[in-house]
Amino acid sequence: VGGVTLANCKTWRRDHPLAIAAPAAVLAVALYAITLRGTFIWDDRFIAQDDPRLHDASGWRAYLHAGYRPNAVDNLWRPLTSLTFWAQWRLTGGITWRLHAMNILLHAAVSALVAALAHRLAGARAGLIAGLLFAAHPLHVEAVAYLVGRAETLCAAGVVAALLVMARRPLTVGRAVGVFAGAIVA
């Protein structure tokens, strides 16, 4: 008699931000799960497999001041990306499928953030559509399947998270600091 269903539950609404963001995250995981069988390719070998700093317990310090690629002269500096690879090596021993799983989870998180941002700016339907399109767009294949593409995914996460914070009205000092910090990290 009058059981609780998703349709009548007061704590669950179809337009709730989590209800909008979750399908995008699930789709991202489903679409890219096949990459769990991937191996190290191209720059993955230099940056996410053979970099001696990955295998040194104190190697994280070198990422704070040294370049992205070992012994390179290009001056790329991506400490957040490098530190995620270092941490994963320390925690998982560099098992390839786990490195790929992190890229998939990061893409799922960014897809959910895109859905949440579109939901905030244009409503529930727009959020759902934007999140699903972002999750499934083929442009992201390289960033998710190629391990070093993590740099782009982390950048997108910082930018979209900052925009999401900024989209809240009014923009308080605390939120402004959060937006600035997100932009710096990105």
Q: How should each PLM-predicted stretch be described?
A:
Residues 1-186:
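Polytopic membrane enzymes that build or remodel cell-surface glycoconjugates and lipids
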